[in-house]
Amino acid sequence: MPLYRKLLGVSAAAALTASVTRARREARRRAIELGAPFGVLPTLPTGQAQRVGVVYNPSKPGAAAAVEILERILAANGHPQALVRTTRVDEPGSEAARELIAEGVDLLIAAGGDGTVRAVAAALAHHEGRKPRLGILPMGTGNLLARNLYIPVSDVAACVNIALNGAGQAVDAIEMTTTSAPGEETEHTFFVMSGAGFDALVMNDTNEEIKAKFGWVAYVQSGMKHMLGRSHPVRISVDGAPFRTLPMRSVLIANCGRLQGGIRLADMTDVHDGNLEVIVASPRDLVEWGLLMAKVTRRTILGSPRVELPVIRHLVGSEVVLEFPDGAQPVEVDGDPAPSAHRISARVLPAAVEVAVHPEVL
């Protein structure tokens, strides 16, 4: 057999093995995420006693009850009583987190929605010196960081067990600056995904009553309303490269890519690889929206290799600058509204936070 055929055979076998390994790993992670409510996820062995701090959002249904469950588990396993702080309308959790870090807690738990988790994690990311591990009790609609770490969002006891006894996963942060006008800059730190254009319109125009009753369905309703808007140019520079101009309906900066329902939007980056992914979507009509959705669905269900389409482009690097020549675009940060901007810059902060996850996820 010619050498080139042998090499092709070896390459094909290696690719198949890698694909099967990835599929098995993803299936195991999904089993952890989905199996906990049905008793499939075994309780992890109890570790040594820890000083636990909790920041929770009292406006979230079930948050206070979750803290009570946490305190019962702590008492039953010989841990000291938790130090508990609440968020406020004018203080989403960063200040409370800094207080608990100063108290010297070993584990800092964020109990709330994506905003609370982001605020607590951001305080950890920017802390100089010893950092406690972050635990997550997801109580929101999206719970996106928890989903990307395969934390079982519907089982409080399992989340507490993972927070107390899980393994540590290093997670990158993304530091982003939005410029609304000359001299008007806003700093943000996020951990999942932020964007400008269509997705920000959807997030900013979501009906809160529908969201409270039906969860992510509210985003679908808002998305249908804004689906057929016009494109705008965006100038993009990744890692200091020359600017390139692309049409866009939406541009996203992603630290990781799983959304509700396991949908994977970003497919070139992960939470701990030191990179961010820029996704530029430019569908002009219902047919092109269909192509975009088909690509995302194929990737989500089949784990298919990335397929380039004219309506969606992916760029990867450690920093990016976006400029909008047509004027300021609406912006969202991990699903929360932010000031509109005509310029956005972002860079990765590698391994900024250590998050407690189930050991099988690593």
List where the protein language model places each region.
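Short Gly/Thr/Asp-enriched flexible loops that form oxyanion-binding sites at enzyme active sites
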Residues: 116-129
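N-terminal glycine-rich "phosphate-gripper" loop used for MgATP/nucleotide binding
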Residues: 110-115
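Oxyanion-binding "anion nests"
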Residues: 76, 230-275
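ATP/NTP phosphate-donor binding region
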Residues: 2-108
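Short hydrophobic-aromatic micro-motifs
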Residues: 16, 183, 187-195, 201, ...
